[in-house]
Amino acid sequence: MKKNAFTDYQKFCLEGIKPGGHSLTVFALGLGGESGEVLDSIKKAIRDKHPIDLEHLKEELGDVLWYVANIASATGIDLNDILKFNIDKLTKRYSLGGGNN
């Protein structure tokens, strides 16, 4: 994967948005909705005892990622910075014998 792939993706996500077209509130609510669709997809597979539809799950996770990228942009945060921060946090947690997440 390219070093700045997440930054490039973040910029790509912004290309389809008109200036002033969406607000942080719209992005946050969209993230909640799409996260719910991810959960619903998993719930239905468990409830109906069938494999998760991976193509549908990829689609919904892509929608989640789109909203995360736009929330990051709306708040002035680069996705690569989020990744680095999270890797550092998890590395520290695991090295201290921390939790599972």
Which stretches of residues belong to each language-model region?
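Flexible "arm" and connector segments at domain edges
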Residues: M1-L61, L65-N101
